[in-house]
Amino acid sequence: ADTIVAVELDTYPNTDIGDPSYPHIGIDIKSVRSKKTAKWNMQNGKVGTAHIIYNSVGKRLSAVVSYPNGDSATVSYDVDLDNVLPEWVRVGLSASTGLYKETNTILSWSFTSKLKSNSTHETNALHFMFNQFSKDQKDLILQGDATTGTEGNLRLTRVSSNGSPQGSSVGRALFYAPVHIWESSAVVASFEATFTFLIKSPDSHPADGIAFFISNIDSSIPSGSTGRLLGLFPDAN
């Protein structure tokens, strides 16, 4: 199975797999059962921003999800990522729908990682920024139902021709270049990611959510990972 670290924006409470009984953001380490969650007032049809940071000195992964009206949710978890992830990874965005559905639209996405090493005092950095997504976005690996180009956006899950979200859909987009996320000689490894998103649903229960994830470089969508598994995990263990 893939090695996954993720920050989930979970719109549907699957209490049978340990979710709290409300929409939440959570930090997932190798399992869809979040290590830490925080209540999240998801605003249907409003553009939100997710900001994720990690620093190897504090060994803390943190996320803030906010809306223009000032409503925000914050979650953080202490984890040493070099004990969890391989040295080289890919970063991506994933989303799914199940019985219930929602649009999982990404309007922008940026990422920066830095590795400061002792030996040379050098910093290795990788940075990318998408303020829009073109139809033929060569620097993204699209998996499942993910598509780019409609109104300059990245759509992670399927929508019908009139824009209605479809159920039982899963899609992911990964940046094409592998990221050197840690190195034994590095003094500091850090990264930050930001994306803006629009989740819209005609249902009273939108589902299932969007996640920012870091994985082994050859990661693919596990079979059967629509719905509550967010396109990331093969099962709910």
UniProtKB/Swiss-Prot annotation:
GO molecular-function terms, A-Z: D-mannose binding; metal ion binding; toxin activity
Residue sites binding Mn(2+) per the record: E8, D10, D19, H24, S34
UniProt-annotated binding residues for Ca(2+): D10, Y12, N14, D19, D208
PROSITE patterns: LECTIN_LEGUME_ALPHA, LECTIN_LEGUME_BETA
Pfam families assigned: Lectin_legB (PF00139)
Annotated transmembrane regions: none
Keyword entries, A-Z: Calcium, Lectin, Manganese, Mannose-binding, Metal-binding, Toxin
Keyword flag Calcium: yes
Binding of a carbohydrate, residues: Y12, L99, Y100, R228
Database matches in CDD domains: lectin_legume_LecRK_Arcelin_ConA
Record family assignment: Belongs to the leguminous lectin family.
Purpose of the protein: Glucose/D-mannose specific lectin. Has anti-inflammatory activity in rats. Induces histamine release in mast cells from hamster and rat. Induces lymphocyte proliferation and IFNG production. Shows toxicity against the aquatic snail B.glabrata at concentrations higher than 20 ug/ml.
Quaternary structure and partners: Homotetramer.
Note: Binds one manganese (or another transition metal) ion and one calcium ion. The metal ions are essential for the saccharide-binding and cell-agglutinating activities.
The protein's name in its UniProt record: Concanavalin-Br
